[in-house]
Amino acid sequence: MVGAVVAAGGSIVGEGFHGRFGEAHAEVEALAAAGAAARGATLYVTLEPCCHHGKTPPCTEAVVAAGIARVVIAARDPFPAVNGGGIAALRAAGIAVEAGLCEREALRLTAPFRTLVEAKRPWVIAKWAMSLDGRMATASGESRWISSAESRAIVHRLRGRVDAIVVGIGTALADDPLLTARPDDGAATPRQLVRIVLDSHARLPPASRLVQTAREHPLLVAVGPEAPAERRQTLAAEIGRAHV
């Protein structure tokens, strides 16, 4: 969601992006790619550089140490430990800072992160296939395939970018899905999503493809207190994670 570019003399001398939580931030990656060319250059970044110690050191310190002369920020970081503090730290170090360039695009790009920080909940994407008359299945319950090959390819790419996918027990029983990310080009997915089934009565069959692949692909079954103890124990034994 966060990318950075170092530019000098009208040319890009370094690029970087934040791959995942806990890894080096976009600014640090871009500065490392630029090396000595970063001195006196301009840093463009989609989100305000952090100024606190977390999983990684403050990006503001790396920017100052690299000798960057100017920083252009698309959007402020809503995280309470930053939220304008990064801009203030850079300006205090004598670096020219501009904020708000392509802000609308940056806000859209960082919407999942902002939702987590501001609304205290995950970013949720609703996906379904529906016919022109508003139906999701035929009268007999058949639904394969309302969607097209093109839309299914998009879904698999999307699965490769999210942390989890959630379905109800009805879908799990009717479709016996895998719910894994399987890009049509065979490319490796950037992350392994957790498959979640909402199953209040612990009805997910041990022979289902979800359970049978639980050792290779993470599976979490959320069951209710009314679920029979024997079924809960069976699921827990099969997948190791049957949460009540």
Residue ranges and their predicted role:
Residues 24, 56-57, 84, 103, ...:
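Structural motif corresponding to alpha-helix initiation and N-cap regions
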Residues 29, 33, 62, 89, ...:
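Alpha-helical scaffold segments in soluble metabolic enzymes
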Residues 22-23, 87, 101-131, 135:
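Proteins enriched for Cys/Gly/acidic motifs involved in redox and nucleic-acid/cofactor modification
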Residues 34, 94, 117, 159-162:
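Structural signal for hydrophobic packing residues in well-ordered secondary-structure cores
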Residues 6-105, 194, 220, 225:
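Zn2+-dependent cytidine deaminase-like catalytic core
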Residues 115, 123-128, 132, 136-241:
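Active-site ligand-binding patch in enzyme domains
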Residues 2-10, 128-129:
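Short beta-strand scaffold segments in enzyme catalytic cores
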